[in-house]
Amino acid sequence: MLFRFLQTLARFCRFLLISVLGFRFSPLLLLGYVKLQDENKHNSESALASGTDAKQPEAAENVTSSSIDFAVNSVVKVFTVYSMPSVLQPWRNWPQQESGGSGFVISGKKILTNAHVVADHIFLQVRKHGSPTKYKAQVRAIGHECDLAILEIDNEEFWEDMIPLELGEIPSLDESVAVFGYPTGGDSVSITKGYVSRVEYTRYAHGGTTLLAIQTDAAINPGNSGGPAIIGNKMAGVAFQKDPSADNIGYIIPTPVIKHFLTAVEENGQYGGFCTLDISYQLMENSQLRNHFKMGPEMTGILINEINPLSDAYKRLRKDDIILAIDDVLIGNDAKVTFRNKERINFNHFVSMKKLDETVLLQVLRDGKEHEFHIMVKPVPPLVPGHQYDKLPSYYIFAGFVFVPLTQPYIDSTLICNCAIKYMPEKAGEQLVLADDINAGYTDFKNLKVIKVNGVQVENLKHLTELVETCWTEDLRLDLENEKVVVLNYANAKEATSLILELHRIPSANEYDYQWQS
């Protein structure tokens, strides 16, 4: 748990919010968001998603004027009013801001865009090409891991003359592509052209996950986010991010990821995440390592280092198992499998495309003998959640202490980087202090995890709240990391809590996001 004096926190917080606002609390990621924002916010983000003056490649034969005319009638501009919650003061939101992005119409009277275009939204509007009218929109479903969102508009006038785009296939290398959208620099639709450079497993900046992505040299700038990438008369993907460290490197979400998202929403009514084996592993490129684990000269695979106890793999696989193949496809010593001709891709792509509770067949070498296991896959929450969009953070306030679960946004905001890997997400996370006589002498404690409340091990934030609220002893004792101890007179602390809430204009002593209690 983290203890921080409020006045010091306020000064520190102000600096942090200026420096990380354009990152949407993800400053450690390599790839920047592609989002058109108000002037101040755009300036803070320009280092990540700035444009390039490099000359764009000429159009190839499969990006024709007819395909451009067809696609332009599907593209829309998205206007977003949003307010992000304060990570360090979780009972409040920051002032509203405006941003924008792109989107396009798909079948079923739906609009597809990026999740980061509408994240933390309060109000959404959409304007179609060639129209001055803005239409109110609602988010039907959102997947932050895959950076996709579905919008709906309850106005039949909007849908007149709108042409839905069909999903195509993964483009080939060097195939020409046209990216549509509303990037910075103007108000009308923009079209940039380029070629497919790579198709590989890539880190998605917004959600912090790794999924299949298309790399292109077509210009992708702030505001392009959510716009379609077109090949012929079909959509090859959704523009979503770029590499700020290099020229002409933009990224497109490919149709397999899009189809997985859309199918999950259609079948389950909501997005449920991407499946994973949830293991940590190492490559087997060293011949001495392969010999030690009794791998034959023809064998290739990966070495399991650790397995998440919450996953189905934990019941069947073991540390030091060698995974040789997945669904009868051999895994190389570099953890990659064959993908389209001579292209290779990380084996996790096969797992991520599975539906909830489907199985993968793993061929495993254990103690020199081969085995086969059917492993059920499902989305498994990370130890520390990488994002917390579209909701207030969970917290609990007692006697001026503010308890919150550990999250990556909190780590980013407080510059705590080394503790992320050692806490489980269901544990009570950090704590800061609202100054009061009741907690005098404790305000200098920081970066300390709460271990016990009155001798009982803390399981999660809700459990901590219950332990505090049902205290029957005169003193409340909190045992912290590094053998630190907090003792409060319970009756006095209970009375002080109400006064502190009133003094700091905090509407409630607690807020729960129940995903933390599972």
Curated annotation (Swiss-Prot):
Catalytic class of the enzyme: hydrolase
Transit peptide extent on chain: 1-23
Active-site residues, record numbering mapped to chain: H116 (charge relay system), D147 (charge relay system), S225 (charge relay system)
One Gene Ontology CC term in the entry: mitochondrial membrane
Domain PDZ, chain residue ranges per copy: 278-358
Signal peptide start-end: none
Protein name per its UniProtKB record: Protease Do-like 4, mitochondrial
Keyword Transferase (UniProt): no
Pfam families membership: PDZ_3, Trypsin_2
Lineage: Eukaryota, Viridiplantae, Streptophyta, Embryophyta, Tracheophyta
Function comment: Putative serine protease.
Stored InterPro entries: DEGP_PDZ, DEGP_PDZ_sf, PDZ_sf, Peptidase_S1_PA, Peptidase_S1_PA_chymotrypsin, Peptidase_S1C
Gene3D superfamilies: 2.30.42.10, 3.20.190.20, Trypsin-like serine proteases
Record localization: Mitochondrion membrane
Family: Belongs to the peptidase S1C family.
A molecular-function term among this protein's GO annotations: serine-type endopeptidase activity
Signal is among the record's keywords: no
Organism domain of life: Eukaryota
Keywords per UniProt: Hydrolase, Membrane, Mitochondrion, Protease, Serine protease, Transit peptide
Organism in which the protein naturally occurs: Arabidopsis thaliana
EC numbers on record: 3.4.21.-
Region (Serine protease): 98-262
GO biological process: proteolysis
